[in-house]
Structure formats: structure tokens, C-alpha cells
Amino acid sequence: MPEQLNTRVEDCFLQAESFFKRSFKRPQVSLKLRGQKAGVAHLHENLLRFNPQLYRENSQHFLKQTVAHEVAHLIAHQLFGERIQPHGEEWQLIMRGVYELPPDRCHTYEVKRRQVTRYIYRCPCADSDFPFSSQRHGMVAQGRRYLCRRCRQTLVFTGETRVE
């Protein structure tokens, strides 16, 4: 999987070098990105980070568009310096002129939300549930108390959990 990604990064740099008739410093490439972002270019570290899950699920479009998008950020930074907008004219010029791709700011990949466990707490005064995150539930285990806003009584764990 990373071989194709590295090959595409190199191809993008070769295209830019041919277009601008100069060489560019190659970045370090990492697949350590999670969440909603498909890719991130760290300009000062000369580092590209890509989301392996989104790459696996959308590999063809990812290789074509996302890799070029992130490489274009590094090329724009090396060519035009610090004082440019992330998706400004310079970056758009590279996307259109060098890679002949639309300068799309955001991807449209479907991002699966991670499942979260909620711990159900109740108050003696009302028939209401208070779903706690695992972090807050852990704080209760360490002795922290949470109070009902209505009656000021301590919320009590019911033993129930819910996956959302």
C-alpha cells in the first residue's frame, strides 16, 4: 500500500520539477493521520501525513487528487515562501497548471465515525439519564463527584452502557 503512495508523491514532484524547471526537496511521508482529514502537509518539517483508512477506502481518487493536493502545498511553500494563503492563488496555480486537477479544498470521502461507549448515570430526583464519556466515567472511579443541576444530588452509575 505505501509503495503506490510514495510512487505518486515522487511522480508529483517530478511533474512539478519538469513544469518549473528546478528541483524540490523531497518530504518524509507518513501514514499516521486519523480522523476526518485525508492528508496534511507540514511545511516547515517538509512532511506529508496521510490517513490510511481513507486511502484504503478511496485509493484511486486519493492517489490522484489528495496526494497532488498535499504535494502542491509543499511546492507552493518552496516556491513562494511563507506569506501565501494555504489554498490561495499560488496553490491553485500548481493544482491547475502542474497537475491539471481541480483545486478542491476539501475531500468528499465518507468518514466513519468511531463508536463511542457511554456510561449511564442517574439522579434520584428525576427520570433522566446522564450519558458519561469513558473519560468522565474514569474520573468518577478516581473519586470525582458529579451533581444533578436540579436537585444537587450526586449522580450514580446504573451499571448500563450504550454504544453510539
From Swiss-Prot:
Transmembrane segments: none annotated. The keyword Cytoplasm applies. Belongs to the SprT family. It is found in: Cytoplasm. GO terms for molecular function: zinc ion binding. Coiled coil: none annotated. Its main location: cytoplasm. GO terms for biological process: response to stress. The active site is at E70. Zn(2+) binds at H69, H73. This is Protein SprT. The keyword Metal-binding applies. One of its GO terms (cellular component) is cytoplasm. Pfam families: SprT-like. InterPro entries: SprT-like_domain, Uncharacterised_SprT. Keywords: Cytoplasm, Metal-binding, Zinc. The gene is sprT. PANTHER family: PROTEIN SPRT.
